[in-house]
């Protein structure tokens, strides 16, 4: 089923890309599921040019992040900068305030200011083709960070978490918490995913729906709003406010009469926060299961207080460490370590990739995963306790 889904996503998204340019972002093709190809290997990059690298330690690395508005990108950038500097590199770290022209300008400046390699978390996967042509002309390798850059043959490697697995873990959590294989049902669920210009959003949603769709088809899960297709449930810029506004409308139309809402699939924490805000203001029934991703601090607090059921934890220290390893290998004239050479096609060919494995956090294990590991300090959470009536 996963092969069929990912192939369908690629075909659909590539068609949208050709018709809409910088509109909805393209999907990726999987001739072999990512989780079936996790043995780390060293693979040649899609392009053979390495003239822009140096065989000695040191050099200047450009790191382009999309925004500081989401906590996770702050942590990604900070972790990356610290580890690259520790490895002996000069770092040009830039945030673009979710503005595409700003990010394009920042990358252009990195290219012209002597950066020998680029690590880019794109705002929109289809928006960087022209500026990356400049990088290609100067033989500057490019690592797409967490978000695949589409339709550019300048992309050398891709580093991310297993985004399909993120979605399946969210779907499995809902399945298990509602005991869908044994309970009579039906249960009401609503669906909220991410930005249509973010390639990962289709993977998150696709993975979750591979788990949940059979129960929807069987009538055990019911989407009362009727909103189930990706374009309808997508949330521009992963905006908390947009997710909240849409959830306000869904509650008003479908749950204001006391109808029970059992679960809300949210692909990440910023959308989950919007859904939570809406429920607090408008919903009077038993609190539903709410999923998320990124373990942002406000959402961890909501998990502890019973307002959010779980969040996928993607330890950015792990991803940053792997990217530094990849950068170091290429800068020394070698090949970056990868563990997937079949899944991520950006429209110009398969991009050699390294996929880190995500885990999920909830009220039972957040302390071990987030605090005991040093990812967060306990100061912000010590005054909160889990309610005895929580469903999580």
Regions found by a protein language model. Name each.
Residues 11-17:
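Bacterial N-terminal signal peptides
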Residues 5, 18, 22-384, 390-392:
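A residue-level marker of the well-folded mature domains of exported/periplasmic proteins
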Residues 1-8:
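Bacterial Sec-dependent N-terminal signal peptides
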């Amino acid at each position: 089923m996963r092969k069929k889904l990912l192939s369908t996503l690629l075909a659909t998204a590539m068609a949208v890309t050709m018709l809409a340019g910088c509109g909805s972002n393209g999907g990726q093709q999987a001739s072999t599921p990512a989780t079936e190809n996790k043995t780390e290997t060293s693979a040649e990059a899609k392009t053979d040019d390495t003239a822009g690298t140096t065989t000695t330690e040191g050099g200047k690395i450009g790191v382009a992040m999309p925004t500081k508005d989401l906590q996770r990108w702050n942590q990604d950038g900070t972790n990356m900068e610290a580890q690259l500097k520790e490895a002996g590199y000069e770092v040009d770290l830039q945030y673009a305030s979710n503005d595409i022209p700003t990010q394009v300008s920042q990358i252009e400046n990195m290219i012209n200011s002597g950066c020998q390699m680029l690590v880019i978390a794109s705002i929109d996967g289809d928006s960087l083709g022209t500026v990356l042509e400049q990088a290609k002309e100067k033989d500057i390798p490019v690592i797409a960070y967490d978000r695949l850059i589409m339709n550019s043959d300048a992309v050398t490697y891709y580093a991310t978490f297993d985004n399909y697995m993120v979605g399946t873990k969210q779907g499995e959590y809902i399945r298990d918490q509602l005991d869908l294989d044994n309970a009579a049902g039906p249960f009401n669920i609503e669906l909220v995913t991410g930005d249509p210009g973010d390639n990962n959003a289709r993977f998150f949603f696709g993975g979750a729906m591979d788990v949940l769709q059979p129960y929807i088809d069987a009538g055990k899960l019911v989407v009362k709003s009727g909103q189930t297709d990706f374009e309808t449930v997508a949330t521009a810029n992963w905006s908390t406010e947009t997710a909240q506004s849409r959830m306000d409308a869904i509650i008003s139309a479908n749950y204001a009469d006391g109808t029970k809402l059992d679960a809300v699939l949210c692909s990440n924490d910023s959308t989950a926060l919007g859904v939570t805000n809406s429920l607090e203001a408008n919903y009077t029934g038993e609190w539903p299961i709410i999923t998320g991703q990124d373990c942002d601090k406000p959402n961890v607090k909501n998990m502890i207080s019973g307002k959010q059921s779980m969040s996928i934890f993607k330890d950015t220290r792990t991803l940053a460490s792997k990217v530094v390893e990849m950068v170091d290998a290429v800068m020394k004239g070698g090949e970056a370590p990868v563990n997937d050479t079949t899944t991520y096609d950006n429209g110009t060919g398969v991009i050699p990739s390294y996929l880190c494995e995500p885990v999920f956090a909830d009220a039972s294990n957040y302390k071990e995963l987030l605090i005991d590991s040093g990812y967060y300090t306990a100061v912000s959470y010590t005054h909160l306790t889990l309610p005895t009536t929580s469903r999580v």
